[in-house]
């Protein structure tokens, strides 16, 4: 059985918390895309664990964890994150953590050129705005992957005669193409090569053939949970391009990033923040550049785990959520951070877009259109009540339940979980 957790908006919806709640029922947690460019925090017994690249299933001592072939891996960051988690008590993580031999490697020069590229794009744009990259080298690594010039994990750990010489040769050739593109920037290639030569033996115990690993798990009737990174609106194909990440962050990325056929996927859980946030540039139809937006930002503590950047805030956008649902095929929803809305007397919800006076029938792919739509709202009554101590769905205020029902009716997908606070147990489950 394979179930999937996916972000439905622009990321930061709270996917990790749902995964954390679910992992006790699973044998394997796998990541299928992205790198250390996303982040979430899980609190267990009062201890905060920050995850950026590693699967959050590591908090469950009985769970195996896999970084799939679609993930791009910066080895120094991999070990740094692992050591940080170990320092907080996850001492058995090394025996339960695996990396696909087909995953691509992120080098420091990928990160360097990521930032150079961002500056270059900002200089070209009329408004001086950039894409909003995290600078972690994710985009350049996927670029070298697509051009078939990248290096994969198996290239590094290969013990065949001449394997290291081939790795070194390809590394130098890859670096040279970067320098041809961005100029002869100061960079110590010998230092990085020496580091990777030392990483080789340390990395070997983690490396597996991920296709064999996962399909053996499926054959053994093990339960597999896929932890999506980022979210659908950051998908390279279906997101607000070019203000997106460089991988497929929707259901398609699960299939290609792990080698799992679609017939094996049973449930797709869409994680939806009760309002909308976004980090970086790009159109945001329901954004509130006013006191309401500042209030959402303040109460919701909307700062990125990985970058520390302030998140832009706005009302829930059901046009966007319906589009996300069409593509990912959610079987149920997890509405998170509902408690952030506790003190709002009225809560507007975006239900349609108008452009040049006409209602749009689909989510626009053109940013000039999306950036200039007029959002039509339905205003729902707030509940003006602290819900953080509520332990059962049925005990939620009536207006809170009406808010959730409005979402269900609009996208035609049932709400299964509701987040009512930051704690691990602040999640209500609804029978569906």
Swiss-Prot record:
Which keywords does UniProt give here?
Cytoplasm, GTP-binding, Ligase, Magnesium, Metal-binding, Nucleotide-binding, Purine biosynthesis
Residues the record lists as binding IMP: 12-15, 37-40, 134, 148, 230, 245, 309
Which family does the entry's similarity section mention? Belongs to the adenylosuccinate synthetase family.
* Chief place of localization: cytoplasm
Gene source species: Candida glabrata (strain ATCC 2001 / BCRC 20586 / JCM 3761 / NBRC 0622 / NRRL Y-65 / CBS 138)
Question: GO cellular component terms?
Answer: cytoplasm; fungal biofilm matrix
* Reactions this protein catalyses: IMP + L-aspartate + GTP = N(6)-(1,2-dicarboxyethyl)-AMP + GDP + phosphate + 2 H(+)
How the cofactor is bound: the record states: Binds 1 Mg(2+) ion per subunit.
Q: What is this protein called?
A: Adenylosuccinate synthetase
């Amino acid at each position: 059985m394979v179930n999937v957790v996916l972000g439905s908006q622009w990321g930061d919806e709270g996917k990790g918390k749902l995964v954390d709640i679910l992992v006790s029922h699973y044998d394997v947690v796998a990541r299928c895309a992205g790198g250390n460019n996303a982040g979430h925090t899980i609190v267990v017994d009062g201890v905060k664990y920050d995850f950026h690249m590693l699967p959050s299933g590591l908090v469950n001592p009985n769970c195996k964890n896999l970084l799939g072939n679609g993930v791009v891996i910066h080895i120094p960051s991999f070990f740094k994150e692992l050591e940080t988690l170990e320092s907080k008590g996850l001492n058995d993580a090394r025996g339960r953590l695996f990396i696909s031999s087909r995953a691509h490697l992120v080098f420091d020069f990928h990160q360097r050129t990521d930032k150079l590229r961002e500056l270059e794009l900002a200089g070209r744009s009329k408004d001086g705005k950039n894409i909003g990259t995290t600078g972690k080298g994710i985009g350049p690594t996927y670029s070298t992957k697509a051009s078939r010039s990248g290096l994969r994990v198996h290239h590094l750990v290969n013990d065949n005669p001449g394997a290291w010489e081939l790795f070194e040769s390809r590394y130098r050739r890859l670096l040279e193409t970067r320098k041809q593109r961005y100029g002869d920037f100061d960079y110590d290639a010998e230092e990085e090569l020496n580091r990777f030569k030392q990483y080789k033996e340390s990395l070997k115990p983690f490396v597996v053939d991920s296709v064999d690993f996962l399909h053996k798990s499926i054959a053994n009737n093990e339960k597999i949970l896929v932890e999506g990174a980022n979210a659908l609106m950051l998908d390279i194909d279906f997101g607000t391009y070019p203000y997106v990440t460089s991988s497929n962050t929707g259901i398609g990325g699960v299939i290609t990033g792990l080698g799992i056929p679609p017939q094996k996927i049973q449930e797709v859980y869409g994680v939806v923040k009760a309002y909308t946030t976004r980090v970086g540039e790009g159109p945001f139809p329901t954004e509130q550049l006013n006191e309401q937006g500042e209030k959402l930002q303040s109460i919701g503590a909307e700062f990125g785990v990985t970058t520390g950047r302030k998140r832009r805030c706005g009302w829930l956008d059901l046009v966007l959520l319906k589009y996300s649902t069409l593509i990912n095929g959610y079987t149920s929803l997890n509405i998170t951070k509902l408690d952030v809305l506790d003190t709002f007397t009225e809560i507007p919800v975006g239900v349609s877009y108008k452009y040049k006076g006409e209602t749009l029938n689909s989510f626009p792919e053109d940013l000039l259109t999306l950036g200039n739509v007029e959002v039509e709202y339905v205003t729902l009554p707030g509940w003006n009540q602290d819900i953080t101590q509520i332990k059962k769905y049925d005990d939620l205020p009536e207006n809170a339940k009406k808010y959730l029902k409005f979402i269900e009716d609009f996208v035609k997908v049932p709400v299964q979980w509701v987040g009512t606070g930051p704690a691990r147990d602040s999640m209500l489950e609804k029978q569906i």
